[in-house]
Regions:
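Membrane/wall-proximal cationic-aromatic binding patches
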Residues: 1-63
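Conserved beta-strand elements of the Class I
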Residues: 28-32, 71, 99
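Structural preference for long, well-ordered alpha-helical segments in enzyme cores
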Residues: 32, 86-87, 139-141
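Short, solvent-exposed loop/turn segments at secondary-structure junctions
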Residues: 36-37, 76-78, 104-109
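Short, solvent-exposed loop/turn and secondary-structure capping segments
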Residues: 40-44, 82-84, 110-118
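A conserved hydrophobic secondary-structure block that centers on an alpha-helix together
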Residues: 53-92
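Proline-aspartate-enriched helix->loop->beta-strand connector
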Residues: 91-100
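Serine-dependent acyl-ester chemistry module
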Residues: 105-172
Length: 172
């Protein structure tokens, strides 16, 4: 993969700093997605959402003199359930005018079905018999999740960023 410079802003987003309060004369676009949206392998200026802002800035019929602001909420390995939770818990407070979901058919379908996904320790949508949708959070009670969520597990995860051997153990 590429070697993009990664900077995370104070809100935990791979993006420049954005004020929560939207300026009066702006069109705010929120991007949700997985690794394609987070785009860790390229520099910020090379991401599709950074270029989207530049392209829309040159399209006066779209913005009619308003400032275009694009905010990236993409996180690698997120499925649609996690993207929905991000929308609900983080995105709405920024008051976006437009929300774009970056969807990649190569893995986003399997990432959203528990028995197809290799990522077992995340929330999934459940389609109930009464035709309602709920969120399966059973992973919170699993032993592997509890271990990795503990202080020692978090230390292990941080150390594994610097050790191929620890990364191998993490995958097992």
């Amino acid at each position: 993969e590429g070697k993009g410079e990664i900077n995370i802003n104070k809100d935990g987003l791979r993006d420049i700093k954005h004020e929560i309060t939207k300026s009066k004369n702006s069109i705010r676009i929120a991007i949700l997605g997985d690794s394609f949206a987070e785009a860790r392998s390229v520099n910020l200026e090379e991401t599709f959402w950074f270029k989207l802002k530049d392209d829309l800035d040159s399209c006066f019929n779209f913005h009619k003199g308003n400032e275009i602001e694009v905010i990236n909420f993409g996180v690698s390995e997120y499925g649609t359930t996690q993207q929905y939770l991000t929308l609900k818990n983080n995105v709405w407070k920024y008051n976006p005018d437009i929300i774009l979901l970056a969807f990649y058919s190569g893995n986003d379908i399997s990432d959203n079905v528990k028995y197809l996904s290799q990522k077992k320790y995340r929330p999934y949508f459940l389609f109930n018999e009464d035709e309602t949708i709920s969120i399966d959070r059973s992973f919170l009670d699993s032993r592997p999740y509890k271990i990795l969520s503990s202080p020692s597990g978090q230390t292990f995860i941080k150390l594994s960023q610097y050790s191929r051997i620890l990364q191998l153990f993490r995958e097992v």
